């Protein structure tokens, strides 16, 4: 009998702090048993994609660079857009490979935290990231006004 759901994790998961990824920065990540790459484009938008270039498999998070809204693979310079599409190939700049895509992980930033959506089949979010401070109005909405239970993480989140 096939169950109508997966036993694998599905939902929004905190994957870091907003302050950890500056504009133009590329970071390797490992979550959900997958290598990922996080980058903040030149406009300040944060993106998370599958970590390996579809050209020859280099990990984009190790040495990759941001060019506009794309992340560039350090191996041969292929560029991948925030929608996962191949946008540029150095030796054929007018003809990117539109058949190749990287998996895109939807990302939200809330109160200095970075959350990524994971669903094993790659489906889009089934619900929005809840705003816990609005859900529980008796608590202050200032992120500096609440107690962080792990002091070693608090120092990483400071501005």
Regions found by a protein language model. Give the residues of each.
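Rieske [2Fe-2S] iron-sulfur-binding subdomain
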Residues: 1-46, 68, 79-159
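A glycine-rich beta-to-alpha transition motif near the start of alpha/beta enzyme domains, typified by
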Residues: 50
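Short cysteine-rich clusters marking metal-coordination/redox-active sites
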Residues: 53, 73
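Cys/His-rich metal-chelating microdomains
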Residues: 56-59, 79
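The serine-hydrolase catalytic nucleophile loop
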Residues: 58-67
């Amino acid at each position: 009998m096939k169950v109508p759901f997966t036993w694998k994790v599905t939902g929004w998961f905190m994957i870091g702090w907003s302050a950890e990824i500056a504009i133009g920065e590329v970071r390797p990540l490992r979550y959900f048993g997958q290598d990922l790459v996080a980058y903040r484009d030149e406009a300040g938008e944060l993106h998370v994609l599958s970590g390996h270039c579809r050209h020859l498999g280099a990990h984009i998070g190790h040495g990759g660079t941001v060019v506009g809204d794309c992340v560039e693979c350090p191996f041969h310079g292929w560029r991948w857009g925030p929608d996962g599409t191949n946008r540029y190939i150095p030796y054929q700049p007018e003809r990117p490979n539109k058949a190749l895509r990287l998996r895109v992980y939807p990302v939200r930033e809330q109160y200095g935290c970075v959350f990524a959506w994971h669903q094993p089949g790659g489906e889009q979010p089934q619900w929005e990231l809840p705003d816990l401070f609005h859900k529980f109005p008796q608590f202050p909405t200032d992120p500096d006004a609440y107690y962080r239970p792990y002091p070693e993480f608090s120092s990483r989140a400071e501005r």
